[in-house]
Amino acid sequence: MSPKNITRSVIPAIDLYCRKANFKTLKSLSMILGSKKEWYDTKKAPLRTFLVSRCGIFEQLRGRLVEDGKVNLFSVFLTNDSFSFCKMTVDDKFNTSLVDWQKIPFDSTFATDRRQNISLLPVDTLFATEKIISILGVSPNMTNLVSIERERSDLVDFNCKLQSNILEHLLYAKCQGVYVTSTNEKARLLAAVCNPEFIDTFWCELTPIRVSLKENPSISVPREYQMYDPVVRATIKEVVTKRLLRSAFDNDIDPLMCLHLDKGWKLKFPILSSTTGLNFSLKDCLSLDTGKDASDMTEVFLATMESSKVLRTYSNLVDIVMKDNGRLDSGVLKQFNDYVKQEKLNLQHFQAGSSKFLKGAKI
């Protein structure tokens, strides 16, 4: 039978159209699906394989969203002395609502036997992992995706790195395919490891920086700063977080990057009532102690927002490739290519909006 006449399920259909797309389209697809990895930039086959495997996660979410009408998205960021997390709910219209957003210190309540800190004993790390899951507030009646990231700074000592690594592995294992209640036929708790490179690319890589950095009075040699510099990316991510919060607070919703804040959240952010634009500090807005705390909270916020936007993009791609039950069609291939191109342009347009705020940022 001709390949054109073969019907396919979703993932094989996506794989087919990825095979037929050119390399440039695949690179753009990796960006809009929050999966861009620099070391795949010269080889089509491993990039396609990686993208299709990533789509498997979002296919599970998409299916649950169709069935249940809502899903919960979580992002967790582990450090040696705390964890930050963000929870958002996405409905079947891809409306995204902020539900929870906290930074929790690893105090004595995360340790056993009245110890003041988490030890590397299995009983301690397992206890801490289960406590993290209980704090997240997963719903037994909804599908919950938990994206997990850990601190990777070279400045952290070996034991601290080891603790974060162990907690990351245990949290992933505890969340992957868990049946929250014994009567559920489908796993309600899913897990994914969040690569910080994906977050940086999705929110930062297309941001024009050169002109704005030249006009920044705090920078004496703008050429010394490049997009790959951690300080530049951290600054852009802070700007993006403030943009999204301001838009949500003012109900000035970008249809592609919308976030809903209910009245309760708006009362928690009084500084947004007394300021305009981005003239506020995330540290003060979130009542945090340090800039590092604000950076950690930014990371989980943007990771969760990225997941919600990628889920929408992925679902639209599925609608395209399944128009004729997954059959190969030149018209569908053109729609596939055009959609990927347009979504990248939309992302580029959004990122360009961050550029002007770099002029006054402290870098």
Swiss-Prot record:
GO terms for molecular function: crossed form four-way junction DNA binding; DNA endonuclease activity; flap-structured DNA binding; RNA binding; Y-form DNA binding. One of its GO terms (biological process) is mitochondrial genome maintenance. It comes from the Eukaryota. GO terms for cellular component: mitochondrial matrix; mitochondrion; ribonucleoprotein complex. The keyword Mitochondrion applies. Homodimer. Forms a ribonucleoprotein complex composed of maturase bI3 and 2 dimers of MRS1 that assemble around the bI3 RNA. Function in mitochondrial RNA splicing in the excision of mitochondrial group I introns aI5 beta from COX1 and bI3 from COB transcripts and thus would be involved in obtaining the correct structure of the intron, to allow the RNA catalyzed reactions to occur. Present with 5240 molecules/cell in log phase SD medium. This is Mitochondrial RNA-splicing protein MRS1.
